[in-house]
Amino acid sequence: MSVSGDDFDDYFDDEIDDVIVPGTSDTVESVQTNNRPAKQSDISISQGNEEDEFQSPDRLSGNAVQFEDVERTSKYNVFIPKCKNVQENIFVTQLTQPPSPPEMIRGPRWKKPGPEPLAPEPATTRVGANHQSDQYHDEDKEMEAAIAASLRSFEEENGGDVPSTASGSTPARTAAAPCAAPKGTAADVPFDLDDIPDDAFDSDLSLSPPRSTSQATRGPPVQSQFRTNRPLGLRQSTLFDMAARNPDISSQRGEQIFSPPEKSEPPTHHKLNEEALNTWVYPTNLGKTRDYQFNIAQRGLFHNLLVALPTGLGKTFIAATIMLNWYRWTKSAQIIFVAPTKPLVAQQISACFQVAGIPRSETTMLTGEAAPGIRAEEWKSKRVFFMTPQTLVNDLKSGIADPKRIVLLVVDEAHRATGGYAYVEVVKFLKRYNKSFRVLALTATPGSTVESVQAIIDDLGIAKVEIRTEQSLDIREYVHARDTEVQTFQNSDEMVLCMELFTRTLQPLVDQLRNLNAYWGRDPMALTAFGLTKARQQWMGSDAGRNANLALKGKVNAIFTVLASLAHAIDLLKYHGITPFYRHLLHFQSNTDGQKGGKYQRQIVQDESFKKLMNHLQPWTKNPDFIGHPKLEYLKQVVLNHFMDRGEGTAANGDQSQSATRIMIFVHFRDSAEEVVRVLKRHEPLIRPHVFVGQSSAKGSEGMDQKTQLSIVQKFKKGTYNTIVATSIGEEGLDIGEVDLIVCYDSSASPIRMLQRMGRTGRKRAGNIVLLLMQGKEEESYIKAKDNYEKMQQMIASGTRFTFHDDKSPRILPPGVRPVAEKRQIDIPVENTQADLPEPRRRARPPKRPPKKFHMPDDVETGFAKASSLTGKVTKKAETKRAVRKPTPEPVEVPALEEVLLTPRQQQDLERRYCHIAGTSPEFIRNPRVDAYPRLQSVPRPTKAVKHGSLTSRMIGTLQKMGKVSVDCESRYRKVLALDSSKEIVDSVLSRDPWPPAKNSGRLGEKTHAFKRPSATPRPNNVHVREDENEDNCTPELVSPEKLMSSFLEPHTERPPYSSQRSQDAFELDFPDVETLLNRSAERHVSRKRNRFVLDDDSDE
């Protein structure tokens, strides 16, 4: 075979995957020995005997490639590699793409055939092949088998018919380059290279995961766990208009049958309705059954599922179906539907009431507006809850909601479930107390990066993903057409003038940062807040910033702060209009009034260019007909044309509620929203716009609470407003089927926000989308967001980049239960037709907040644990002796006196039997004597059961003291009693105490008398007043000073020890005997013992 110079050029222009370029060391040597490299030579591959046009590279390796000189010069230069490389055949089981240097040309890679041998091919006669060895024939067959296996695998992945290899007639294989075959060659290769698609040997695993080769060679494949009526011969294309070689099973058309996973797990704690477990209900109230909704709902019953569907394809219907079946399967378990805002919650309630048929009496809607006491009552009596995630977190933490009763959690707008959002906190809290609950996550845009999607899967415990794109086969017929119009604009003359003046104002500050190497940009109009923040951080972290003095650091920080505050004004001017730009500059200028503001802020305000700019802006903004941005003018024309084309305002009655079309306009800032509303209100009543913003209040703009937001949405649905100008609050979840036009006033670099905006239209009928973009950065952001969305959808559909958590998805249903689908009409209760929301009624006096309740997780260790027990070492406890149990004394009532006294008959019996002793000598029985046996009486005698009483103890003590008295005590006491009669006056004075005790006023050292008591006569310690004077005369008797002084001046006689002040010479005291003393002591305790129970009988009385 010979190839001319032109054919050689075309040969290298083709893709390397389409042809096989044989190369050997001999070829390289022949090229290097060519004396005329500028001339292109013809290629002649000559072999001893003519055989196939293309043979195995190994067969060609032994033949030299001869170059014949030609006089014609080629326009291409032949690349001569410096290193010799032998391009060998590589046979692999999977078409992976290993890393290899681009300068090295490798040989072809072939996929090996299956383990089972292929059908024997018919023998063919090769002309002139007798001189070749059998080794070449074996390698040729191996290559042919590899090509056959590759083509068969490709056809299977695309659902096409696999060509039979056992047939005797096979198409002839021809060369890639058109050339005539020499005479005498036999073209008996069983495949044609033209029949092999361009991407047959593509190694992209995300698009074509490897399949078992056994299925490709064994005939009919084994029936899997689902059956499908997918039509053959269809070829699905991807978002990039490429052939999808392995369409995901979930996107196949037709109904599939799934079963609960077989898992070994403990039985659920929920009470199940065994009669309803055999079937699961699919509502047919909405008409035709959609296969993708049937398949997704079935899988969501048995797995923790993430559903990613384009907007308007019935995610709420899927959620309502799953909620209905878990409501049937359980008796008292609770089902929760959470959505970010109250308008979304209210929207889902109305949809579930009309689809699932769950009784209204079992349903409630809870938000932060309801009192905690009312919410506690709702948690006790209801089973289905629609609420915001923040309210659910508060109820779970306070113990109002029981986490163990929850069996299903439906999460709407699940792309928010990242970081510390309330969705994540709810799932974490439930996992601590409940191991048996299902999670269903709904979203239209799962995420913009692989990390964000994986975070959603991890935080929610997702086990399966069901994703569809607008090009999926099973949803294509239900997707309404949406025409997207992208309109780009250039800056107007007024905007250019403002940019020039503002550039002159900011240029000095930018130059100062450039001179300090703190910022490298030259154009002030390219300033962004994020870029300035990063530049400040880099300069502070550099050597220049760390070594700078405080004055220089303060200067750089001040300049960065001023420029960052004005960077937002630059964005307003570029993308939103002159009026928002002017409002921002007015606020910046007001901060410098008086002594307010810093040095560089006042420098900008006092600049001549800034003053010129403000002089231009002031008359423009005061003109009501002024439109400060080319986007606004185009927007006005688009809205007017839309309403006029739909016949808006032409009704005879002029009823505004008859409006059949709606428009939603999305902006990024509230200033832009107010400016758009101001421009559109000029054309009322044809255009009836209203702004729709979030709850937080900003400077110059008040927020909307959830009640106001819900009211605006209802009026928008009824037709009171036919145009809504919304910020990001309106991007998610609003289902208004009459929205036929979406206008994106500015672009968003986030693919999630962009797709959410576009999803507000095309729900009930075809819709239109108009994107208003400025040339440059905004247009690039839109293209980037679109490409990012398409790439992420492809990654999620392949499922090769994510890790799913099947272990966190419980079965819940008992083992062996396989519910069968039951399609039927659901009877909607009459109570569900009420228009108002199922909110709890407000009360004049709401119930009190219940006390906080702490729920206990399952299998938790209660009580306190010792540190020694945590180490795993078991220590033996010291054996304690068992204490002897003492009998508990019982109270005994004291009987009456009449009951214990002897009767006359008993008295006679006592005297006759015990008091009278017969005999000659008289015997007398007397009371116990205390003077008998003095030594035994003064010592307590041993006791066993009954102890000595208090009276006995006191008696023993008295006798012991009496025993210690000496023999001469009588003479000593007589001296004490024989006192002088002159001492009587002193004794009486001292006993009456003419100096009364001072009242304690609470302060130390306070004096209450004018004079002190004489120190010569100290006051005795034990002074008692006579009894006859103490009772009648409370006031002491006054004594004359002469009599008192005479008593002190008399000679002092030494008093004997133990003298008593009451002793007198005239009489001698008669001390009572011991029996009298004992009787008096007992009488003082009588009154105390009368009303007291006797606990133990231990008295000797």
Swiss-Prot record:
This is ATP-dependent DNA helicase mph1. Its EC number is 3.6.4.12. ATP-dependent DNA helicase involved in DNA damage repair by homologous recombination and in genome maintenance. Capable of unwinding D-loops. Plays a role in limiting crossover recombinants during mitotic DNA double-strand break (DSB) repair. Component of a FANCM-MHF complex which promotes gene conversion at blocked replication forks, probably by reversal of the stalled fork. A motif (DEAH box) lies at residues 412-415. Residues 634-808 form the Helicase C-terminal domain. CDD domains: DEXDc_FANCM (cd18033), FANCM_ID (cd12091), SF2_C_FANCM_Hef (cd18801). GO terms for biological process: double-strand break repair via synthesis-dependent strand annealing; interstrand cross-link repair.
